[in-house]
């Protein structure tokens, strides 16, 4: 769900891309 958004908001959020 927020995976794609986390990449934009949080640069390190790319790791969270595995999340729904």
From Swiss-Prot:
Coiled-coil blocks: none
Entry's localization field: Cell membrane
GO cellular component: a single term: T cell receptor complex
Keyword Zinc: no
A GO biological process held by the record: adaptive immune response
Broad class of the protein's primary localization: membrane
Membrane-crossing segments per the record: none
Keywords (A to Z) from UniProt: Adaptive immunity, Cell membrane, Immunity, Membrane, Receptor, T cell receptor
Function: J region of the variable domain of T cell receptor (TR) alpha chain that participates in the antigen recognition. Alpha-beta T cell receptors are antigen specific receptors which are essential to the immune response and are present on the cell surface of T lymphocytes. Recognize peptide-major histocompatibility (MH) (pMH) complexes that are displayed by antigen presenting cells (APC), a prerequisite for efficient T cell adaptive immunity against pathogens.
Subunit structure, interactors included: Alpha-beta TR is a heterodimer composed of an alpha and beta chain; disulfide-linked. The alpha-beta TR is associated with the transmembrane signaling CD3 coreceptor proteins to form the TR-CD3 (TcR or TCR). The assembly of alpha-beta TR heterodimers with CD3 occurs in the endoplasmic reticulum where a single alpha-beta TR heterodimer associates with one CD3D-CD3E heterodimer, one CD3G-CD3E heterodimer and one CD247 homodimer forming a stable octameric structure. CD3D-CD3E and CD3G-CD3E heterodimers preferentially associate with TR alpha and TR beta chains, respectively.
Protein name from the UniProt record: T cell receptor alpha joining 3
